[in-house]
Amino acid sequence: MKKVTFIFILLMGILGGIIYYNEKTYSPLNATDFQKLFPNYRGNVDKIYDKDFIGFSFHNELFELYLYKMMENVSINENYPKFEEWEKNEIVNKKENSSTWKKCPMDIKEKEKFKDVIASEVFEEDMHGKNFRTILNDTNNYYTYVYINELEYYFFLFNKDKGELYYIRKKGW
C-alpha cells in the first residue's frame, strides 16, 4: 500500500511539474509570427512576462497580456504587417480588420474599438498593464492589431526605446 501511494504521489508530482513547465514556457507568438510583424527581424526574442486576467475557462475565453523583449534592434516598416490570417482566423476585410504599424497615440475611433481593454480595471492592478497605457500614449511607439469582432481581437504595441512588444489576446470576454 505504501509503495502504491508513493508511486501515485511521484506520478502526480511529475505530472504537476510538466504542467507547470508547459505553462511557464508557453508563448502564443512563434518565429513565423514575429516575421509577419517585423519582416526583416532575425534576432532572438524572449518572453519576459505573461498574465492571464481571466484564468481557466470552459468557454475558450481569453484576456491575456504578453511582454516580449527583442534582443536586437528592430526597424518598423509602416507597410507591415500584412495579415492574411491570425490564430486560425482568416482576415476577410483587411482594411477594417487589421492594421499596419501606426504611430502612437491612437485616434479616437480606434480607441473606441479597444476601449474595454484600454480602460480595463485589471490593468490598474498590474504593473505591465499600467505601463501599457503609458506607452500607448508615447508618440515614439507603434501599434497594430487584428480585429475579428468586438469579442475577439489581438493587439500589438511596440515600445521602440526598450525594444519591447506588448501582445494582448482578447476573446469572448
What label would you give each PLM region?
Residues 15-93:
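N-terminal export/targeting and maturation segments
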Residues 10-14, 52, 126, 160:
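Generic detector of intrinsically disordered, low-complexity, polar/charged segments
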Residues 4-20:
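Hydrophobic membrane-insertion alpha-helices, especially the h-region
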Residues 6-10, 36, 48, 122:
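Exposed boundary/loop context
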Residues 90-173:
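Extracytoplasmic electrostatic interaction patches
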Residues 4-5, 31, 119:
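A sequence-composition feature that detects small, non-aromatic residues
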Residues 10-11, 15, 29, 37, ...:
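Generic detector of leucine side chains in alpha-helical contexts
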